Amino acid sequence: MPSLLGLKCLGKLCSSEIGKVPSPERASLRNSHRRLLIEDLSVPETPDPAHRRRGTVIHLVYLYSAGCGPPELRFSSYDPSVAHPQDPHHSSEKPVIHCHKCGEPCKGEVLRVQTKHFHIKCFTCKVCGCDLAQGGFFIKNGDYLCTLDYQRMYGTRCHGCGEFVEGEVVTALGKTYHPNCFACTICKRPFPPGDRVTFNGRDCLCQLCAQPMSSSPKEASCSSNCAGCGRDIKNGQALLALDKQWHLGCFKCKSCGKVLTGEYISKDGSPYCEKDYQGLFGVKCEACHQFITGKVLEAGDKHYHPSCARCSRCNQMFTEGEEMYLQGSTVWHPDCKQSTKTEEKLRPPNIPRSSSDFFYPKSLIRRTGRSPALQLLSPPCLTNSNKNPRQPTRTSSESIYSRPGSSIPGSPGHTIYAKVDNEILDYKDLAAIPKVKAIYDIERPDLITYEPFYTSGYEDKQERQSLGESPRTLSPTPSAEGYQDVRDRMIHRSTSQGSINSPVYSRHSYTPTTSRSPQHFHRPELLSPGVHRWSPLRTSSFSSTHSDSRPNPPFRHHFLPHVKGNEPSSGRNSPLPYRPDSRPLTPTYAQAPKHFHVPDQGINIYRKPPIYKQHAALAAQSKASEDIIKFSKFPAAQAPDPNEIPKIETDHWPGPPSLAAVGTDPRRRSSGREEDEEELLRRRQLQEEQLMKLNSGLGQLILKEEMEKESRERASLASRYDSPLHSASHAPSSKTSSLPGYGKNGLHRPVSTDFAQYNSYGDISGGVRDYQTLPDGHMPAVRMDRGVSMPNMLEPKIFPYEMLMVTNRGRNKILRDVDRTRLERHLAPEVFWEIFGMSIQEFDKLPLWRRNDMKKKAKLF
């Protein structure tokens, strides 16, 4: 009996219409994943052909949906009679299904995604490798990702709840929400689709919650208009800012026109971006000169960042509401200011500056009848000899200038005078100074009383009228008798003021504040027998009969021009021409001093170098005099070579001492010891004076150490000359030599930087040498202490730990007898062990950086 057709590999690809994937990039909840089931069916052979029947094969197709529970079962049927018998030529034409990932042919259960087929084990996530057949998946750039990896790499979080957003989303103001998370801030109700949302810059409000914000019916009626463009806000989002509603694109910066989406600053009802607001209305910090945003600290008319306002003393910031002192551009804490004042009181008193007296007297102007040019200007005097000696005084360290002199004939003029470094200068001297060298301290000259140099009284008017003086020319034409009378009166006046016939043609009056030597005046010699040189000019010095607020100057230079006949003394007109009979033609107004300048042939026509060059000349002159004094102490005024071996300083060199010389040694030694004791006493007094100025615990400690050392020195000096025979050649002097390298090594043990005295030769003259006697009774030739500090002779005082702590503000009270560099030394041993966990001896063995670090942690550094 013929057998039935055997179905060895009969199958059908089944699909569902629901399985259409709308998007190739993502399979969401609506997407279905198809599963293909290929079954091998075999029909048992039946010997009887009549028993052949039509059969129905049912295929189970699993339809998976992401997140929709268990897979759905779909049934599909087909008629096996339709299938062609399996013969070689039909089986070879069947297509072979290959896996898209591994490329192997698919047999059994396979998965189909769109047009691609996968083995079940090959369809996995690209990132984590998990099986995608049991859950939803996402397609990104051709890669298959699980839900967790896709959300982690490409997902968007809700701005309300912070979870990842899937499905329907709401986007507002650049932020994404779940539909249920985008709700009104006040009533917490979600916004329905198509509803209008009001954003006031901070909150999103619905229509019911935003309606009470309208303060008047007018505002309520106009609330639908944009404040920027004026048009009605219809559909879309509205922005509420500055109590107005705006389109999102109409809310712009008034200056640059940039759309404001984040923060803004309002000024006079207009919005600005931060950059433009700072450029137009910003306030800069006085410390860093940057614009201040946020909190600002105000001190007077100055503004600071809270982090920039720091105390100039302790460098700590000021807290809100804290008091401060403001001085110029520096600020202080009240406690720091008080401690500064305390330290200033402990310092040596500063020498007060000398007061600078400025006067603006009137100068007299005379015009001749021949030329309208001004001939002579009388310079001002430093004081007034006829008025009250009390003069207005201004304290200033530099120069001051006043209004310039008038050029109108007959009007009172004013010249510029200033006092710089105890020297009076006029305006031409000030003009000779470069601008970078001159410092002008402007004051109010109108507060100074102006007085003329010479106050004309009734008697002087009588003289001018008697001399025939006219108010226009001020040039008297006296007779011989009247002229002689005026001359005698002038000589008497000049003599009473301290100078007789002393013409001064220099315009530079020099008046220091202290007098060091008496004035010496020179009487000029006679030009010819019977003819005396006479000048109407007088010096600016005064006698003791006139009260003056300043002492006389130590030096005064007088320039005497040689006038012979009618020859002028310079290129200018001579103020006093002579007649052939050796008498002046027409004397000028002799009562007023007429100082004029005789130009030199050099470049500087003012005969005096500028101020900045005068200091160098004075310094060179002082150095020369110091060198003279220094070299006068050397034999033959020659300083010995420091590399040369010094000669033996004894009265008997090069021969041995005789008995007669030895007999005279005790007196000489006794006088030397007295001088040594006087020198030690003088040094001790000097040290005590310096330490009294220091007035600190460290200074008292140094003083005690020095006194103990000097007592040992005196004891050694008393027993130094036990052997009278060899004392002259081996006993060095205990005086400090000011000549290093000549007889002694010149090396001194430094006493202290606080009271070490320096002489003009540069060596220290406050220390006492430490000599140690050798076993044979001789003294060492050279002893040099290098890097050795003085021993601590006193036990440090014990203070509580709270008083020694260094806070951020510093100690409120400065403790006396405390070494600030070693605060830990003033702790009790048990307190020291409690803080540092070790003894003082163990602490000293640690390296310096370790000790400093431990002291910083304990607030003792």
From Swiss-Prot:
**Residues in domain LIM zinc-binding?**
97-156, 156-216, 224-283, 283-343
Alphabetically sorted, this entry's keywords are:
Actin-binding, Coiled coil, Cytoplasm, Cytoskeleton, Isopeptide bond, LIM domain, Metal-binding, Phosphoprotein, Repeat, Ubl conjugation, Zinc
Give me the stretches of Polar residues compositional bias. Answer: 381-400, 467-478, 493-518
An example of a Gene Ontology cellular component annotation for this protein is: lamellipodium
Q: Which residues form a coiled coil?
A: 673-723
Under the heading Pfam families, the entry gives: AbLIM_anchor (PF16182), LIM (PF00412), VHP (PF02209)
Where Phosphotyrosine occurs along the chain? Y417, Y440, Y483
Q: Choose any GO biological process term that the UniProt entry carries and state it.
A: positive regulation of transcription by RNA polymerase II
Keyword presence, Phosphoprotein: yes
Region feature (Disordered): 374-414, 459-590, 634-682, 713-748
**More info:** Isoform 1 is not necessary for normal axon guidance.
Q: What is this protein called?
A: Actin-binding LIM protein 1
- The protein's gene is named Ablim1
